[in-house]
Regions:
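N-terminal cationic and glycine-rich segments that engage phosphates or anionic surfaces
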Residues: 1-116, 121-125, 130-139, 208
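Positively charged, low-complexity, intrinsically disordered RNA-binding extensions
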Residues: 139-251
Length: 251
């Protein structure tokens, strides 16, 4: 299992605390608002909105919160005006990072990100310096007990997925961006509900980190993900799960 999916699995377990859940709700609400602003408030004709709503329901977000976020996005309710922005940077050991944020003040977060990254052994990079290290892909996670590997393979590959991996606690499915909805529909027809499904930035290659660099990398990712304006952090590290767990537990 790659460092990318190992981190996602551990992060999902950590999100169970109330403080983490509050941040998850904030991020999902902002994603719903942005999706509705860009593609309209009807999830049937707006795949990004449909995916964001699924993320909210997976976190047990109340329907009224989802509906208000949609209305703010379409302009039917007043609310803050968010801007989507992506920053590029390097972490310990030359790990490439993409930081996707939704903010009301781009200038403010540039300084905040620069401080967080430099404090943890990295630096911000110019636009284009890191982006080429990643592919835009669909990512779906399905509970392990939902189906056997053979059945999952039949369903997702026939629907257009690129790959199916065992990530320990679930099935990790990678799709071309344009096939994400079709694979989700195929899973739904088979009675399978994903834990998550989203467009992501998947590393082309991974950089192995150990020891102090591994610990510093985990702390950097945590610090960025705890920033209120950060939606996602993508990084091409590969760290043994035991080292990730140790670093998470030390914080």
């Amino acid at each position: 299992m790659s460092g990318h999916s190992k981190w996602a699995t551990i992060k999902h377990k950590k999100a169970a605390t109330d403080a983490k859940r509050g941040r998850v709700f904030t991020r999902v609400i902002r994603e719903i608002t942005i999706a509705a602003r860009i593609g309209g408030g009807d999830p049937n004709s707006n795949p990004r909105l449909r995916t964001a709503i699924l993320a909210g329901k997976n976190e047990n977000m109340p329907n009224e919160n989802i509906e208000r976020a949609i209305l703010r996005g379409t302009g039917q309710l007043e609310g803050e005006q968010y801007e989507e922005v992506t920053f590029e940077g390097y972490g310990p050991g030359g790990v490439g990072m993409l930081i996707a944020a939704v903010t009301t003040n781009r200038n403010r977060i540039v300084g905040e990100f620069r401080h967080l990254i430099s404090k943890n052994g990295g630096n911000l990079a110019e636009t284009g310096a890191v982006g080429w290290m990643f592919h835009r892909k669909g990512e779906i996670v399905v509970p392990k007990e939902a189906a056997s590997e053979d059945k999952m393979m039949d369903i997702v590959l026939e629907a257009g997925a690129d790959d199916l991996k065992d990530d320990g606690s679930g099935w990790y499915i990678v799709t071309p961006p344009e096939a994400l909805e079709k694979v989700k529909e195929a899973l739904a027809k088979a009675g399978i509900t994903p834990t998550s499904a989203e467009i992501s930035m998947v590393p082309q290659n991974y950089i192995k980190l150990t020891g102090a660099q591994a610990t510093q990398m985990v702390r950097l990712i945590e610090a960025l993900e705890e920033h209120d304006d950060v939606q996602h952090v993508y990084a091409n590290f590969d760290i043994d799960e035991s080292e990730i767990q140790a670093a998470v537990g030390a914080n």
